Amino acid sequence: MQVELADRAAARPSETGEAPPSSPAAAAAASAAAEDAPLLPGGGGGVRRRVVVSERFRQRSGSFRREVRRAAEETYLLTRLTLILLRYLGIGYRWIRQFLALCCYTFLLMPGFIQVVYYYFFSSQVCRSVVYGEQPRNRLDLYIPTDRTGLKPVVAFVTGGAWIIGYKGWGALLGRRLAERGILVACIDYRNFPQGTIGDMVEDASQGIAFVCNNIASYGGDPERIYLVGQSAGAHIAACTLLHQAIKESGEGDASTWSIAQLKAYFGISGGYNLLNLVDHFHKRGLYRSIFLSIMEGEESLQKFSPLVMVKDPAARSAVSLLPRIFLFHGTSDYSIPSAESEAFFDALQQNGAKADLFLYDGKTHTDLFLQDPLRGGRDKLLEEIVTVIHNDNPDTSAQHLAVPVARRLVPEFMLMLAGRVSPF
């Protein structure tokens, strides 16, 4: 079976994002020097102050105009893509029912969402929309621990969203919780369908990982301790990215901007790993076959983008040996993506020589592990497992990070229970 993925980004620069930040102390000193410039003439001091203020005003005005223009462009793009998507969806009742359920679900969890959104936009720990590539939505958000001493372990997170509604902001709650435990988090955005297909999503994820590997030290992250995490569709995209990179490195592939060896482990949360088994399942739940096959670039590409199939391919045996440790998490009451997906992927990994662990959570649904449980507060078993693995790799981890703080409740229990009943996931 042909399992190699053409390197769509070979002709493009590997790093087109923001330059790493300069020293905060240097920036503060420069700002203070400008503010303290003399107002009286003599040696040109007054002129210098007026020029600095005028230049700063022009820069701010230009920046504001750029933001307005970008917002207008993104609004237009979103509207156009929505219309395209609606043409794909047609008037089938299943997706309409799912959409209405999603609205009810969102309303019931709104008390928690409001608090997370406030944190996302106003916390000094969040560095939003760092550019990592040339394509639309090639942005990532950084969640930086308050303790800036030393380099921190890093999580590169690929969010879910059924390959259609994924957004880097969905990782805000996870980013916050991990940052509280001394872990720097990079939430990678990527093109969704119909703006891109699965090949574009994998390409974007790969470029985002490359940016993290090559630049995270400038933000206080440790390039020797990077962990890849994916949830739902993001778990599938991240697993595909990981395997395609391993296949490239094990063969005669082109030179890449990052290496599998730079990742300490992969955590897959509620992921789907065999698309051949999921086509009919998704169709029954409202993600119609025609749309799903369009996302996956046709029925002939399902095997190429099925991590379980790739792992079983004898031609990929040398690539599997390059994989980092793999940890899979799944709820047994997940109806969006059955837990059998993680179980089968775990078995295939073990049978082909990969180091893998599987954690099943009785009675947990598709969103319990990632959303309802963190909003509930208290002990978060999934988060504890991830944090334990990361900090166990660092014998010098401080006691304050090993002692997991108890998170406060963000949504009343009765609203969480109702949300669980109406959840479309």
Swiss-Prot record:
Gene designation: IMCEL1
Membrane association type: Multi-pass membrane protein
Annotated spans, Disordered: 1-42
TM spans (from-to): 99-119, 154-174
Catalytic activity: [protein]-C-terminal S-[(2E,6E)-farnesyl]-L-cysteine methyl ester + H2O = [protein]-C-terminal S-[(2E,6E)-farnesyl]-L-cysteine + methanol + H(+)
Function: Catalyzes the demethylation of isoprenylcysteine methylesters.
UniProt feature, compositional bias: Basic and acidic residues: 1-10
Keyword annotations from UniProtKB, A to Z: Endoplasmic reticulum, Golgi apparatus, Hydrolase, Membrane, Transmembrane, Transmembrane helix
Residues at which substrate binds: 160-162, 231-233
Protein name per Swiss-Prot or TrEMBL: Probable isoprenylcysteine alpha-carbonyl methylesterase ICMEL1
Catalytic site positions: 232, 334, 366
Keyword Transmembrane helix: yes
GO cellular component, one term: Golgi membrane
